[in-house]
Amino acid sequence: VYGVALGVSVSYIFIFVLLGSLLDRCGAGNYMMQVSFALLGHLRGGPAKVAVVSSAVNGIVSASSVANVVTGGIFTIPLMKKAGYGGVRAGAIETASSVNGQIMPPVMGAAAFLMIEYVGIPYTDIIKHALLPASISYVALFYIVHLEALKLGIMPMMSAGAPKTPLQKLAGWGMGIAGTLVVMGLVYWIGIGVRAVAGGAATPILLVLLLVLSVWLLRISARHPDLPTDINVTNPVRPESWPTVRSGLYYLIPIGILVWCLAVDQLSAGLSAFWAVMAMLFQMVTQ
């Protein structure tokens, strides 16, 4: 009934756009922005680096250039202008960062789904081959905005908490990265172990474990105050990193489900996005 392009839109693009819209409406876009601001706002040229990193993580969620600019640009562009980048540079940085969000796995632009239909490449292979170029493009943008900050003499912004020594910063980053890797490894091996031991009963067991994980992360987030809906452009103050990260960890569950279904269970792109949408709807009901 449909042509190839329209069939791809109905079969794949719609469900991924729905997932990105639900995540954004639920607050995941603002969470990504606040976390980027908390982690990078203290660096030289922090607003521009926040724009680059927040566009990358928003690209993971939505893969939409327009949505990226709308959700992040209204805050990062004024912040960059206030820091001293100027209107032209600020707009160029936000545009380049947002456009690259379309090639950031696992949710990608329409061209990735057209490749599935025209070439017959599995979506997991597209993700694997797109990850390195997307990462390199954002590393290059991060480096470019740092050079611009050095040329313009832009200084770091103020922090909400007491200043930390370089050793404290290194220890904090080390613990954060190590903890993230440990948690990812535990989740992977627990899932593989349950499938190996339980066999056909693995799916309901994994659903129960996922429900317990969701409730636990919601409980952690409930102990912290809600994130502000925007950044104070007039007088920006960087929030504390760890409380900001913990306040929205449950947003990572739908993204984790999407990646698991695509990479581990080898499900189709549409079915993987469907299960991620179901998880997102559950979170919206229980929030």
Descriptions of predicted regions:
Residues 30-40, 75-76, 122, 152-161, ...:
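Flexible loop linkers connecting adjacent transmembrane helices
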Residues 1-30, 264, 269-276:
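Core transmembrane alpha-helical segments of multi-pass membrane transporters/permeases
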Residues 2-7, 44, 244-248:
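Helix-boundary and loop/linker segments of multi-pass membrane transporters
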Residues 13, 17, 21-26, 30, ...:
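Transmembrane alpha-helical segments of multi-pass membrane transport proteins and ion-pumping complexes
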Residues 116-132:
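Helix-coil boundary and interhelical linker segments in multi-pass alpha-helical membrane proteins
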Residues 128-287:
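Long, contiguous bundles of hydrophobic transmembrane helices that form the permeation core
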Residues 33-101, 107-114, 120:
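Hydrophobic transmembrane alpha-helices that form the pore/transport pathway of multi-pass ion
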